[in-house]
Amino acid sequence: MACHNVSELQDLGCSNQLLLQPLWDSIRTGEASARSPFFPVIFSIFTYLGFCLPFVVLDVLCPWVPILRRYKIHPDFSPSVRQLLPCLGLTLYQHLVFVFPVTLMHWARSPALLPREAPELSQLLSHVLICLLLFDTEIFAWHLLHHKVPWLYRTFHKVHHQNSSSFALATQYMSVWELLSLTFFDVLNVAMLQCHPLTILVFHVVNIWLSVEDHSGYDFPWSTHRLVPFGWYGGVAHHDLHHSQFNCNFAPYFTHWDKMLGTLRCAPHSKRLCAGSESCLDSGEQCTVHLNQKKKQT
């Protein structure tokens, strides 16, 4: 009976692996390109800009398509060319001058050949989720520290807060230290879990998308925070409130650390985050009142 159960588990694992094998085989056909030292930085830039582009188009259309304003956090705001170009320029410059040498060192230490077998689907999904949770924890601690220590904020993090209203290309408008910190945590987590290269690829795509969505300024019915239940995920309004208030919502994605440490504030666009937490609702209302007072003062 025990042998029969073991056999069933092995068959299940093989079937999970077979689901991803065709995809992995197609990637391996371009192994020379995937193993290139230029691949990580090119992949990162094109993935990032590819995710930003739809939101840039929406920002251009927004003044002439009134229905789009219904989904904007700040309906009357659209980034100007003078705001977009510096963000694009800084992203390209930092990736080429700073991120590329770091990825080159990582490439030199990576295996010479890609594995023949794809990961199991369950393993890929679990590793991506764990990497996201680890990244969320690390950035929460990093972010909180850089807001609590004035010198760290002024020296390293203030650049990212120059744009108080979020837009997609402002996602990576940050200091070199901040960008390298994010890159370090990215690499550290997949190394600790010894992730399969396909898992690493998927994690980077998901991580880039979530960060762009958080800064996009658009809250759609299909936004991630509306798909994740129980208010576990913050979302675009959650992060936009951080850019407005500075002293709340330090975690990039999930809400558990802000809830535990009392720094969660609930944006008017996402009251669902406050479900089941009266204290969170109170603090969210206080935060909203503070925001209105701040606008009146200015």
UniProtKB/Swiss-Prot annotation:
- GO CC, alphabetical: endoplasmic reticulum membrane
Q: What is its main location?
A: endoplasmic reticulum
Query: Is Glycosyltransferase included in the keywords of this UniProt record?
Result: no
Top-level EC class: oxidoreductase
For this protein, what post-translational modification is recorded in UniProt?
Answer: N-glycosylated.
Q: According to its UniProt record, which cofactors does this protein need?
A: Fe cation
What does the function comment of this entry state? Catalyzes the formation of 25-hydroxycholesterol from cholesterol, leading to repress cholesterol biosynthetic enzymes. Plays a key role in cell positioning and movement in lymphoid tissues: 25-hydroxycholesterol is an intermediate in biosynthesis of 7-alpha,25-dihydroxycholesterol (7-alpha,25-OHC), an oxysterol that acts as a ligand for the G protein-coupled receptor GPR183/EBI2, a chemotactic receptor for a number of lymphoid cells.
Per the record, the similarity remark reads: Belongs to the sterol desaturase family.
Please give the name of this protein: Cholesterol 25-hydroxylase
Instruction: Give the organism the record lists.
Output: Rattus norvegicus (Rat)
